[in-house]
Amino acid sequence: MAALMESVVGRALKFSSTANFRSIRRGETPTLCIKSFSTIMSPPSKAIVYEEHGSPDSVTRLVNLPPVEVKENDVCVKMIAAPINPSDINRIEGVYPVRPPVPAVGGYEGVGEVYAVGSNVNGFSPGDWVIPSPPSSGTWQTYVVKEESVWHKIDKECPMEYAATITVNPLTALRMLEDFVNLNSGDSVVQNGATSIVGQCVIQLARLRGISTINLIRDRAGSDEAREQLKALGADEVFSESQLNVKNVKSLLGNLPEPALGFNCVGGNAASLVLKYLREGGTMVTYGGMSKKPITVSTTSFIFKDLALRGFWLQSWLSMGKVKECREMIDYLLGLARDGKLKYETELVPFEEFPVALDKALGKLGRQPKQVITF
């Protein structure tokens, strides 16, 4: 009997998180009160994965993933929406400096709803809206399981397209406005790539600070419409590259002050135009290179204008242990979006139509709004 009891207790302890013995009196049979638990599993998930690096339209595919255990410190999130960013494409191509090992699930930011939580999780409940903050790879799937520390709870009243896209691009715009030059109300900035999400955010965030923006766009079909859209966001001046074929581009500024700060995400001639606008001692910050052309700077720009060239990479900034600061800024940006003070173009695309969204994100169909997958 003793051996049998030891065997029962041993098995119970093996499969139970806690075991409580009742106090017994002489002649009573000891009983064991067991608090049982069952393993929490996520539902099966559908995901966009790539098993090798290459062109995204060739190496990505939709797969079914099995359920994943939700451990004691984990949160299982049912994804609501996730964007396709240029950095996502670069990761798949294998040219981004930081990328997950393959095979990998695509995506780096997004918004989801808490589906289940581990036994030690106290900060989240099913139904909460959350985003990975700082961003975390693997958001192009229907269910994501990651540790509690990865997730940041947000206001559910913010439109999902902004919640899904608030980190990578709007946060880049905010940091660049604050980290390089001490700007005051009445100052101005100049940027190329003004129709990008970062560009649109720069216009609106600068305007909230009383800072004017000079915006450069490419000559292409729809440029007049793009100019009007940027003006509606608060852009002070919008020029196409062909309008800048003048001897002194600063003559186009009118009453605007010469900018002390410029942003470049294109490279090539578009970067040179930004440099021409900068005042003596000005700074150009490069955060992208969409044209894949190098930046050429004249010797006179350095000697006679003392210009400074800097770079910004959000991933590097986030790696400096700034989780708290990151989340505070995200809440600020989400508040602006919720109140209609921060807007940008997005297109919601059902998960089943991912190939179409990818083609648009790759530029195969001309200029398109930010593609946001909905699950």
Curated annotation (Swiss-Prot):
It is found in: Mitochondrion. SMART domains: PKS_ER (SM00829). Disulfide bonds: none annotated. It comes from the Eukaryota. Pfam families: ADH_N, ADH_zinc_N. Catalyzes the NADPH-dependent reduction of trans-2-enoyl thioesters in mitochondrial fatty acid synthesis (fatty acid synthesis type II). Fatty acid chain elongation in mitochondria uses acyl carrier protein (ACP) as an acyl group carrier, but the enzyme accepts both ACP and CoA thioesters as substrates in vitro. This is Enoyl-[acyl-carrier-protein] reductase, mitochondrial. Residues 1-37 form a transit peptide. GO terms for molecular function: ATP binding; copper ion binding; enoyl-[acyl-carrier-protein] reductase (NADPH) activity; enoyl-[acyl-carrier-protein] reductase activity (NAD(P)H). It catalyses: a 2,3-saturated acyl-[ACP] + NADP(+) = a (2E)-enoyl-[ACP] + NADPH + H(+). GO terms for biological process: fatty acid biosynthetic process. Its EC number is 1.3.1.104. Belongs to the zinc-containing alcohol dehydrogenase family. Quinone oxidoreductase subfamily. NADP(+) binds at residues 169, 195-198, 218-220, 287-290, 312-314, 370. Homodimer. It comes from Arabidopsis thaliana (Mouse-ear cress). GO terms for cellular component: chloroplast; cytosol; mitochondrion; nucleus. Keywords: Fatty acid biosynthesis, Fatty acid metabolism, Lipid biosynthesis, Lipid metabolism, Mitochondrion, NADP, Oxidoreductase, Transit peptide. The active site is at Y96 (proton donor).
